[in-house]
A protein has these predicted regions:
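Alpha-solenoid helical repeat scaffolds
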Residues: 1-280
Length: 280
């Protein structure tokens, strides 16, 4: 048995060398012989799928994906290979056979959402697939964020806000959902609501520089320049490399005609941290 395993290992190494040399047909012959010896080995089947994808033979890769081990793990791994190669029709053909299976993993719907968005350009279908992913699934957090982004892009702001608040409730330690709320209010020029949200976020994460910057920006938008400057100064004191706060304080001092030497130093420091930023 050990001798057989060693021969199989050597054969697989040879096949990989042939693939590296783009001799895909020769490599595939070796994989086929290995499958005859071990027909349920998912690793060999995946190598065959991968080899055909690299050879640009999508249909043959799909045939291997469909005829390989009848396990969810194998099918999803093969689907991932198709998605990575942007072979969306092949990925969809493989996943379509799983989406009506009540026992199939919820990841199937996440992958189908990717196809709906990237290949079909169908936002509503994408949302439908994402909505079917339950909270206990490991992809739920990502699915929720994508739903918010899609609704935002469609200017469905109230729907997006409902999901943002849902995210805050389900993930209270995730600051991103707080930042999303603030930015969505700012996008709609709802500055008072933005300030309320930013103040709440500041109370939860008092030392978070990004939240502090957004809080200061909201104050600035409301015309409360002195308070905004104080917030930005506190960020610079805490983090002298925060280019956004450096930039704000530098320009504020320059506009006021105060401490111009320091203003120049702050702006130079901001430029050093973000040399390609358009507003420095």
């Amino acid at each position: 048995v050990m001798e057989v395993m060693q021969r199989a290992g050597l054969a697989e190494k040879l096949a990989r060398l042939l693939e590296a040399d783009r001799q895909f047909s020769e490599a595939n012959e070796i994989y086929n012989s290995l499958i005859e010896q071990d027909p349920d080995n998912p690793d060999i089947w995946i190598r065959m799928v991968e080899g055909q994808i690299r050879a640009g033979k999508g249909q043959k890769a799909l045939d291997y994906a469909l005829n390989g081990p009848a396990t969810y793990g194998y099918k999803l791994t093969a689907a991932t290979l198709f998605l990575d190669a942007r072979m969306y029709p092949e990925a969809e053909a493989l996943l379509d056979g799983l989406k009506s299976d009540p026992n199939a993993p919820d990841e199937v719907h996440f992958y189908l959402a990717a196809i709906a968005y990237e290949y079909h350009k169908d936002v509503q279908e994408t949302l439908n697939f994402l909505e079917s992913i339950p909270p206990e699934n490991r992809f739920y957090d990502r699915a929720l964020r994508l739903r918010i982004q899609l609704l935002h892009d469609q200017q469905r702001y109230e729907d997006a806000m409902q999901l943002i608040l849902q995210g805050q409730s389900q993930f209270p330690t995730e600051r991103d959902f707080r930042l999303m709320e603030i930015h969505l209010y700012l996008l709609q020029d709802r500055y008072k609501e933005a300030l309320t949200a930013a103040t709440a976020a500041q109370q939860i994460w008092p030392s978070d520089d990004e939240i502090a910057y957004v809080y200061g920006s909201v104050l600035d938008s409301l015309g409360r320049k002195r308070e905004a400057l104080a917030v930005m100064e506190s960020i610079v004191a805490r983090n002298p490399e925060d280019y956004q706060a450096l930039n704000y304080v530098g320009y504020s001092l320059a506009e006021q005609g105060k401490d111009l030497e320091r203003a120049v130093l702050l702006l130079e420091a901001a430029l050093k941290q973000a040399p390609d930023h358009a507003y420095i």
